[in-house]
């Protein structure tokens, strides 16, 4: 019974994943996960690529003719397209042909979070339980550092199990040691694992990195991953600016009792399906975990 409850929960959408009038459009996209990821990847330019001057001067690269992309475009368009619906609406506004042939000038510049929630949204539109997941991945550069990253997790009904998939990394110039459509769970460091690993001195703080400018390392980075993932597990895929206000106000310097509260949350998140009801209880009864800071508050 609990399993059915969980699967039904992750078929539901949030203000970030609801596609509104674009639900039927998404429902008719390819069912094959590889085709779906490649198609989605070709609609998007990662902001890190857009800000690279060498890439910006290329007429023929993976991203397309980058010389035709106006320099006035925002590097990080996550600011203006925070929801899956807004991403699809902008893509179709620029060019209604949603194909792998989309020109660079008609793509949007968003990060892994948008890739993760967009894929989750499309899968939900097809009636497939799906959720965005936040954490850290060493496979971004294979240099020993785990960079903050978002991926998608969905339930494979045929195999009766959850799968991890990374739409953002479907790039031909990035070779992986595993299948991006079925990522081994030990290859992705979820927010809770990173947080507890730092608390227990399992990880060198310098190897857990949140890609702000300047970068945030260690415990403070892991707290971000912890809360991004907790909210995602509750179908609330908050944007990067959102973080519990009490933590932001304290500049991520907490009392030991407050860290112990997070220890409890993180330990439950290690097995989010088994502890789903307990996580929902925390969600419903500890408002400080949900009162967010943002750009204007």
Indicate where each model-derived feature is located.
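Secondary-structure boundary elements
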Residues: 2-106
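His-Asp-centered catalytic microenvironments across diverse enzyme cores
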Residues: 5-14, 37, 41-46, 56-73, ...
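A short, structured loop/turn motif at beta-sheet edges
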Residues: 31, 124, 157-159
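Active-site neighborhood of thiol-dependent amide/isopeptide-bond enzymes
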Residues: 69-150
């Amino acid at each position: 019974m609990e399993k059915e409850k969980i699967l039904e929960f992750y078929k539901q959408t949030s203000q970030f994943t609801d596609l509104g009038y674009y639900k039927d459009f998404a429902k008719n996209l390819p069912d094959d996960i590889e085709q779906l990821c490649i198609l989605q990847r070709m609609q998007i330019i990662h902001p890190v690529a857009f800000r690279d001057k060498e890439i910006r001067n290329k007429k023929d690269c993976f991203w397309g003719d980058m010389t035709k992309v106006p320099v006035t475009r925002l590097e990080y368009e996550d600011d203006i397209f925070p929801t899956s619906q807004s991403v699809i609406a902008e893509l179709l506004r620029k060019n209604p042909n949603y194909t792998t042939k989309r020109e660079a000038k008609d793509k949007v510049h968003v990060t892994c979070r948008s890739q993760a929630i967009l894929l989750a949204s499309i899968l939900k539109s097809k009636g497939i339980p799906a959720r965005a997941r936040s954490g850290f991945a060493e496979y971004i550069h294979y240099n020993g550092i785990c960079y903050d990253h978002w991926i998608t997790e969905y339930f494979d009904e045929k195999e009766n199990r959850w799968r991890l998939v990374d739409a953002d990394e479907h790039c031909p110039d990035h070779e992986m040691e595993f299948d991006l459509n079925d990522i081994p769970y030990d290859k992705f460091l979820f927010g809770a694992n990173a947080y507890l690993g730092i608390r227990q001195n399992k990880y060198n703080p310098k190897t857990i990195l949140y890609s702000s400018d300047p970068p945030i390392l260690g415990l403070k980075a892991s707290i971000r991953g912890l809360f991004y993932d907790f909210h995602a597990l509750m179908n609330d895929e908050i944007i990067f600016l959102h973080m519990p206000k009490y933590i932001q106000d304290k500049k991520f310097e907490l009392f030991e009792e407050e860290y112990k509260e997070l220890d409890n949350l993180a330990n439950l998140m290690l097995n989010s399906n088994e502890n789903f009801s307990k996580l929902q209880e925390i969600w419903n009864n500890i408002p400080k975990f949900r009162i967010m800071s943002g750009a204007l508050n």
